Amino acid sequence: MEAVVFLFSLLDCCALIFLSVYFIITLSDLECDYINARSCCSKLNKWVIPELVGHTIVTVLMLVSLHWFIFLLNLPVATWNIYRFIMVPSGNMGVFDPTEIHNRGQLKSHMKEAMIKLGFYLLCFFMYLYSMILALIND
């Protein structure tokens, strides 16, 4: 059963890694003016909720399966994703708003956040892979 938990977490983490790379590529395209702000933000806002749900499911799964260290490692990122989604101002299009993305260095902060998440998801990927192999060996 433990191997199945880590296999699901590993697959979910792969999806989150690809999503983070997509965020970085799209934001860098906006930074270089290859796409306009409206199309960039609509592309990225489409994937905010799947990222939130995917990471929250893994966090809850680690809580339910009593893997406390991994749960506590995932909790801050899941909390940040939920906070960022809840705190979107009412007039904005979403987390990524085309009218505000060039203001106050938001583009740089979104890019930095995507890079940090990519590093975190890569760390989690190898941690889940190691844990899955360990669970398969112990069974």
UniProtKB/Swiss-Prot annotation:
Belongs to the cornichon family. The chain crosses the membrane at residues 5-25, 57-77, 118-138. Keywords: Endoplasmic reticulum, ER-Golgi transport, Membrane, Protein transport, Transmembrane, Transmembrane helix, Transport. It comes from Mus musculus (Mouse). InterPro entries: Cornichon. It is a multi-pass membrane protein. One of its GO terms (molecular function) is CCR5 chemokine receptor binding. Pfam families: Cornichon. One of its GO terms (cellular component) is endoplasmic reticulum. Its main location: membrane. SMART domains: Cornichon. Involved in G protein-coupled receptors (GPCRs) trafficking from the endoplasmic reticulum to the cell surface; it promotes the exit of GPCRs from the early secretory pathway, likely through interaction with the COPII machinery. GO terms for biological process: endoplasmic reticulum to Golgi vesicle-mediated transport; protein transport. Interacts with Sec23/24 complex components SEC24B and SEC24D. Interacts with CCR5. Interacts with ADRB2 in the early secretory pathway. This is Protein cornichon homolog 4. It is found in: Membrane; Endoplasmic reticulum; Endoplasmic reticulum-Golgi intermediate compartment.
